[in-house]
From Swiss-Prot:
Positions annotated to bind Na(+): G78, T81
UniProtKB keywords: Cell inner membrane, Cell membrane, Ion channel, Ion transport, Membrane, Metal-binding, Sodium, Transmembrane, Transmembrane helix, Transport
Pfam families membership: CRCB
NCBIfam families: crcB (TIGR00494)
Name of this protein: Fluoride-specific ion channel FluC
Transmembrane domains' residue ranges: 8-28, 36-56, 71-91, 103-123
Reaction(s) this enzyme catalyzes, per UniProt: fluoride(in) = fluoride(out)
A Gene Ontology term for the protein's cellular component: plasma membrane
This protein's record includes keyword Transmembrane: yes
Gene: fluC
Bilayer topology term: Multi-pass membrane protein
Length: 129
């Protein structure tokens, strides 16, 4: 298999796993009656951001193969997190007159997800050194 096909395969397999995991998270949260606020999207974005931060921190210290980076970073975590769903949820909340919820959804996703990346990188750097 040439490198390009292998890279597509890594992204596709990782993406299938990540998208399935996100779907499972949504179903799990809905089964607990969590519907008033889009916590499932927020949760997957925070978790995905944290693990992407760990991957980036690890890659700064250790060599990571292109296939691993594509499988984990682009495929699995890229499909697990979701900017498009986040965007649709913000528009839906705003359209329903839920402006505070829309604003909180934006703020939480941006601030907490960036903090999760930072926390993961700091955690990795303090535990590895």
């Amino acid at each position: 298999m040439n490198n390009l096909l292998l890279h597509f395969f890594c992204v596709a397999v990782g993406g299938a796993i990540g998208a399935s995991a996100r779907f499972a998270m949504v179903l799990a949260m809905q089964s607990f009656g969590v519907r008033a606020f889009p916590f499932a999207t927020l949760t997957v974005n925070i978790i995905g951001s944290f693990f992407l931060g760990l991957l980036l921190a690890y890659a700064e210290q250790q060599p990571v193969s292109e296939t691993t980076r594509l499988f984990l970073g682009v495929g699995l975590l890229g499909a697990f997190t979701t900017f498009s769903t986040f965007s649709v949820e913000v528009v839906a909340l705003a359209s329903q007159g839920e402006l505070l919820k829309a604003a909180l959804h934006i703020a939480f996703n941006v601030i907490i997800c960036i903090a999760a990346v930072f926390a993961a990188m700091m955690l990795y750097s303090t535990t590895v050194k």
